[in-house]
């Protein structure tokens, strides 16, 4: 009930971006717009994943704090092969993985594991943006 109410409230907020982006779409947007790619890996049966999404990711998207990154939210159960590749086999959920393009055309990877309040996510975003600007 609370998550439904939160979804309704957040859907009426005009600023920010949609959080539920498909990985392929988010990756493409990241490359085209030269933005860091933030991948949130979770599962619907994971309580910490639900709390992360509802109390950190969705409110940050609603206030525009995620506008400088391209965001993908991936359900571990829906795409286990992609999750295995992105997490490098790390099983802990949830995970926030930040990919930033480097000067050689490759991607640098930063990781937050477990539930995270807004401040560590803000720090991760700032770090990724600073790395992008070099």
Regions from the language model: what does each represent?
Residues 34-37, 42-45, 92:
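Short pre-active-site segment immediately N-terminal to redox-active cysteine/selenocysteine motifs
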Residues 18-35:
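A short beta-strand-turn-helix
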Residues 17-21, 57, 61-81:
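Thiol-based oxidoreductase modules, predominantly thioredoxin-like and allied folds used
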Residues 41-44, 74-77, 99, 114-115:
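Active-site-proximal beta-strand/loop segments in catalytic clefts of secreted hydrolases
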Residues 1-16, 134:
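N-terminal targeting signals for export/organelle localization
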Residues 91-134:
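Non-catalytic, surface beta->alpha helical segment in thiol-disulfide oxidoreductase systems
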Residues 84-91:
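Electron-transfer interface patches adjacent to heme c in soluble/periplasmic c-type cytochromes
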Residues 41-55:
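Conserved redox-active cysteine motifs that mediate thiol-disulfide chemistry
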């Amino acid at each position: 009930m609370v998550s439904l109410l939160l979804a309704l409230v957040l859907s009426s907020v005009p600023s920010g971006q949609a959080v539920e982006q498909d990985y392929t779409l988010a990756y493409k947007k990241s490359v085209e717009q030269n933005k860091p790619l933030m991948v949130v890996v979770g599962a619907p049966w994971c309580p910490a994943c639900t709390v992360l999404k509802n109390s950190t990711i969705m409110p940050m998207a609603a206030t525009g704090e995620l506008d400088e990154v391209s965001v993908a939210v991936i359900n571990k159960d829906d795409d286990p092969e992609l999750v295995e590749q992105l997490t490098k086999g790390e099983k802990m959920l949830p995970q926030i993985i930040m990919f930033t393009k480097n000067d050689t055309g490759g991607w640098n990877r930063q990781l937050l594991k477990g539930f995270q309040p807004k401040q560590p996510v803000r720090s991760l975003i700032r770090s990724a943006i600073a790395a992008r600007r070099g």
